[in-house]
Amino acid sequence: MLQFVLASASPARRQLLQSIGINPLVYQSNFDESSVAIADHHELVQTLARCKAEVVANQLAAPALVLGCDSVLVLQGKIYGKPKDPADAIARWQSMRGQSGELLTGHTLIDLYQNKTLVRLEITQVDFAWISDRQIAAYVATGEPLNCAGAFALDGRGGLFVDRIVGCPSNVIGLSLPLLRKMLTALGYSPADCW
């Protein structure tokens, strides 16, 4: 069995991996995302995912597969990561409701067994429901949107306020499972090698 390391403290990403039989070692990268200033949204999330994975990979003494991810919501050309505070989350939801956005997740898989690195991008369209200010305030009061890129969790209460997903649902939660399978295959592995 291959050692699999998740370079993220995200409970949602860990749970996605566990749901497919991968029980990763979890390391938080503590990479300073503000140190990266890239205007292109696609390049930004891929670069951040790579940096997070590299920070963790450089700390490991033994070979492993290291997965780093970074997600943002792009709505009307603007990037939204995690909200700063409840007021920010409320303002975001007021601008997001009734709109469509793209959830971008950069994925980096570093193979320390073969000294190879793959960097990929998954994009999923998210159509948000039109919800009232009261619903927004109640949702933000749960605290859930404060821990999520785009201020919503598809696999939580936020799923109530998403009308449609076009593309990969697991990508919206934090990592694309189909893309991970493709990345493992490209490196010559099967997901079962990580079970």
Swiss-Prot record:
Keyword Hydrolase belongs to the record: yes
Known EC number: 3.6.1.9
Function: Nucleoside triphosphate pyrophosphatase. May have a dual role in cell division arrest and in preventing the incorporation of modified nucleotides into cellular nucleic acids.
NCBIfam families: maf
GO (cellular component) term, any one: cytoplasm
The protein's name in its UniProt record: Nucleoside triphosphate pyrophosphatase
GO biological process, one term: nucleotide metabolic process
InterPro entries: ITPase-like_fam, Maf-like
Residues at the catalytic site: 70
Protein's organism: Cyanothece sp. (strain PCC 7425 / ATCC 29141)
HAMAP family: Maf (MF_00528)
Subcellular location: Cytoplasm
CDD domains the record matches: Maf
Protein keywords: Cytoplasm, Hydrolase, Nucleotide metabolism
